[in-house]
Amino acid sequence: MPVNLGQALGLLPFLAKAEDATFSGSDVIQQRELANPETARQLFRQFRYQVMSGPQETLRQLRKLCFQWLRPEVHTKEQILEILMLEQFLTILPGEIQMWVRKQCPGSGEEAVTLVESLKGDPQKLWQWISIQVLGQEIPFEKENSARCRGDKVEPALEAEPTVEVVPQDLPLQNTSSAPGELLSHGVKEESDLEPELALAASQLPARPEERPTRDQEVGTALLPSLQEEQWRHLDSTQKEQYWDLMLETYGKMVSGVAGISNSKPDLTNMAEYGEELVGLHLHSAEKMARAPCKEDRQENDKENLNLENHRDQGCLDVFDQAPGEAPPQTALSDFFGESEPHHFGGESVPEALENLQGEGTGAHLFPHERGSGKQLGQHIQSSSSGELSALWLEEKREASQKGQARAPMAQKLPTCRECGKTFYRNSQLVFHQRTHTGETYFHCRICKKAFLRSSDFVKHQRTHTGEKPCKCDYCGKGFSDFSGLRHHEKIHTGEKPYKCPICEKSFIQRSNFNRHQRVHTGEKPYKCTHCGKRFSWSSSLDKHQRSHLGKKPCP
């Protein structure tokens, strides 16, 4: 049964960026009894790991924040499930639609779906709300909804107060990314949901001089082509400043602390000269952001081997597809308001891109430059209104294609051992393997003169001389020199026996005991006496037998 969650998911001012929303242990204690469920929800969602507190304290604080948000002492399991489903549904919505739906304070998932469906029939509703937020004005209907969400009483005078609307009512909803109007839709997103690739566009904005804007017609045409010139003239200087602030908030804020780019506004009089370039940069930035790190990796990988390059390029794709710890990817507006033209992903049609993603899944059939350019990322690459940017992009793709054709197949360049023919992923692995043929060792024990290839084996061996046992059992306190011995010992306390014989169903703690037991059923005798050729199933039986050839009596 749906529960009314208007209070729990009502619209409140969003928190700052995720990196700024950190809470210490004292902050959590102060929020023990939160009267506002929305504040508790945002405290839980924005909570970050504190290194100084440690994992146990962090988990305790996170559990407390979760209890404050979901309130299991008040809500039933069905109500808690409804809260989580509604929260996840709102999170995956596009930023513009998400903010609008949260403004309406949906009480359940079904109500949120109804609100989203209503936008399909009347997309003007969303654009009107966006324009009102940009201009800083509210009509009485919006004020009444906001007051009801907060639980305040609506004054009669507020309902009857006339409002002069300067926002055009016939703004068309544009979905083509070649139109700069799409930049407005990105301006109302939360700062934590802004995609990092937009930072490249901010670096192209020139610093704004101290002069005031004079050519209003060019400004209106460059910022929002759907805004008619006649309507742009009716906006005063303050409203135009707020219009630009929205654009700058999208492209400038998140870059100011990283790249040192100024947040100063460019001269609005020159805005028409590069208004179209903003759109081209927005489309072109995702391509360059995906390709740039992979290009640096290729320069390093050429020094080692081509196969390592393959793995690192795949890593670049994984990182670009979904950044860790961030919100789930949001759906594009075009998925709600369909287009007649087919989408293209990295130069491929939708079926071709899906076939590549569902094939090998690793991009092994692509050249490294194709993986780095986002051919499997599903990036929405469309034609830009700037001819120079389109020509530049095509030229870069052509050069990358020529470089890729000159490369030899991957399998022919894998590092291979000349002695045994074994192949490896890295040259470093091949060098280490070759020591087994040459007998070369790097680590020598000063006490017993024993040599080792690996440093980890050398450290374990030294503990036999020093008696050091750093690994302690939590149950009985017994010490062990390595973690493998500790893991085997802990199975005695837990009763875990992961190795089970499929014939007699007998279980064993250690793999070695399980392997010895299987020889009883198979009759395998791998240990052979070098004197008489007799074979044995266990090494201990072979040792006893060899003593008979040497004339020694077995130990009692």
UniProtKB/Swiss-Prot annotation:
Location relative to the cell: Nucleus
Highest taxon in the source lineage: Eukaryota
Intrachain S-S bonds: none
Gene3D superfamilies reported in the protein's UniProt record: 6.10.140.140, Classic Zinc Finger, DNA breaking-rejoining enzymes
GO BP term (any one): regulation of transcription by RNA polymerase II
Keyword annotations from UniProtKB, A to Z: DNA-binding, Metal-binding, Nucleus, Repeat, Transcription, Transcription regulation, Zinc, Zinc-finger
GO terms for MF: DNA-binding transcription factor activity, RNA polymerase II-specific; RNA polymerase II cis-regulatory region sequence-specific DNA binding; zinc ion binding
A matching Pfam family: SCAN
Residues in C2H2-type zinc fingers: 415-437, 443-465, 471-493, 499-521, 527-549
SCAN box domain sequence ranges: 41-123
GO cellular component terms, A-Z: nucleus
PROSITE patterns, sorted: KRAB, SCAN_BOX, ZINC_FINGER_C2H2_1, ZINC_FINGER_C2H2_2
UniProt function note: May be involved in transcriptional regulation.
Family of the protein in this entry: Belongs to the krueppel C2H2-type zinc-finger protein family.
Name of protein: Zinc finger protein 18
Gene: Znf18
